[in-house]
Amino acid sequence: MQNLRHFYISGIFLLCLTACDTKQNQTDTKTEDANSAPVSTTECYSYVTDKDTIATQFTLANGNITGALQYKLFEKDKNTGSLTGQMHGDTLVAEYSFMSEGVQSVREVVFLKKDDNLIEGFGDIEEKDGKMVFKDKAALKFDSNTPMKKMECK
């Protein structure tokens, strides 16, 4: 009879252990799901002087960006278009698709993110597959004369 009681107590103990372990595994899975959810942020930057404006707003999710970019430079045509690309560390590399003088164009743009600024990169370009792209991204010069400052999105 005492052996039977030990048997029941052991069985109940094993059931409790199994139930506790199952609950722990479920908690771990939920934590992983919450941590692996894609994080999305929207950022806005602008450079404004008396006669010039450069502005962008984009959403960053899992290293990919989508948004808009606008150039309104004195005595030049206004360009407004879409931006799609990726963040590589502190560097944003994207295609800027825009309309200028009634012509749809696509060109590569590269911005360096430094503190709360986006600084545009400039360098030699060439046409590839109907798009203007940089010949050598490693040779780009980043012009800090027109830094876009981070601002609150409207």
What is the predicted role of each segment?
Residues 21, 43-45, 152-154:
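Sequence contexts marking disulfide-bonded cysteines in secreted/extracellular proteins
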Residues 16-19:
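C-terminal motif of bacterial Sec signal peptides marking the signal peptidase cleavage site
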Residues 21-39:
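Short, low-complexity, disordered segments immediately C-terminal to signal peptides
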Residues 59-86:
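N-terminal glycine/threonine-rich, aromatic-flanked beta-hairpin/loop signature
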